[in-house]
Amino acid sequence: MSQVSGQCPSRCDAPHGVPSAALDPAQTMSLLPGLEVARSTHPVEASSEEGFPEEAAPSMPHDSGLRAQQALNSIDLDVPTEAVTCQPQGNPQGCTPLLPNGSSHDHLSEPGSAGHAGNGALGGSKAHRKLQTHPSLGSQAGRKSRGSARSASQVPLQAQEGKAPAVRIHRQTASPTCCLRNAQLSGTALRSLRLESQGHRELNNKTLSQSNNKKPGVAAHAAIIPALTRPKQNCHDPSLLPGTHGVGKEF
């Protein structure tokens, strides 16, 4: 009994704990196959558990199809169906309608019109609005055309045909108003010149008189100068000579 009780702890500790050195190699080999079998059984169970979801997954669409058929069967199909059509009521604010290829915003109809231009399905055929020119622009165009016609009429025929342009210088005849203006200008110029000459003469005379008053000997020379500047009428007349007044005359 003592031997059996002494060997039991060693055998019981072997599977749970580390086998002691007292165990024989035959006993250890007998324990290893049991462990390998236990390890091999776990992957089989795991693979079997993984196989169940794969089988359950395809069953779900089948169940959903059955539910859809039941829902369709429960709906009454005797209700008459009518076609529902929607017509555009108006362009909402902040939205622009779609345009067909090759069209522009000018082709859009007015807001009050019935048809609206879209992708080409709802747009109706309408006459395009003609732009009216401003009357001022029309008058300017007419003036330009008249001016071009007049200028073309004044150009010589040789120049219009592409030949060498003939240069002609036309003397403009002076109008009577221009002549009067020129005469008035010339008259005023002459008057101004005369006044200037008179002013110069007066200044010269004043300066001479002042100088004569200061210098007594200059008076004789001042009297001689105008006599020399006079035109010579009779050189033989002794009365015209200076300093011979009253010589040869009888009183």
Swiss-Prot record:
> GO cellular component annotations, sorted alphabetically?
cytoplasm; nucleus
Instruction: Cite the residue spans of the region called Disordered.
Output: 1-64, 84-167, 230-251
Q: What job does the chain carry out? A: Inhibits the transactivation activity of the Myod family of myogenic factors and represses myogenesis. Acts by associating with Myod family members and retaining them in the cytoplasm by masking their nuclear localization signals. Can also interfere with the DNA-binding activity of Myod family members. Plays an important role in trophoblast and chondrogenic differentiation. Regulates the transcriptional activity of TCF7L1/TCF3 by interacting directly with Tcf7l1/Tcf3 and preventing it from binding DNA. Binds to the axin complex, resulting in an increase in the level of free beta-catenin.
What's the name of the protein?
MyoD family inhibitor
Q: Which InterPro entries match?
A: MDFI/MDFIC
Tissue-wise, where is it found? In the embryo, highly expressed in the sclerotome. Also expressed in the notochord, neural tube, limb buds, heart, branchial arches and head mesenchyme. In the adult, highly expressed in skeletal muscle. Expressed at lower levels in most other tissues.
- Tell me the disulfide pairings in this chain: none
Q: Which GO terms describe its biological process?
A: dorsal/ventral axis specification; embryonic skeletal system morphogenesis; maintenance of protein location in cell; negative regulation of DNA binding; negative regulation of transcription by RNA polymerase II; negative regulation of Wnt signaling pathway; regulation of gene expression; regulation of JNK cascade
- Subcellular location(s) per record: Nucleus; Cytoplasm
| Low complexity: bias regions | 138-154
Question: What does the record give as the organism's lineage?
Answer: Eukaryota, Metazoa, Chordata, Craniata, Vertebrata
Assembly, per entry: Interacts (via C-terminus) with AXIN1 and LEF1. Interacts with CCNT2. Interacts (via C-terminus) with Piezo channel composed of PIEZO1 or PIEZO2; the interaction prolongs Piezo channel inactivation.
Which key words tag this protein in UniProt?
Cytoplasm, Developmental protein, Differentiation, Nucleus
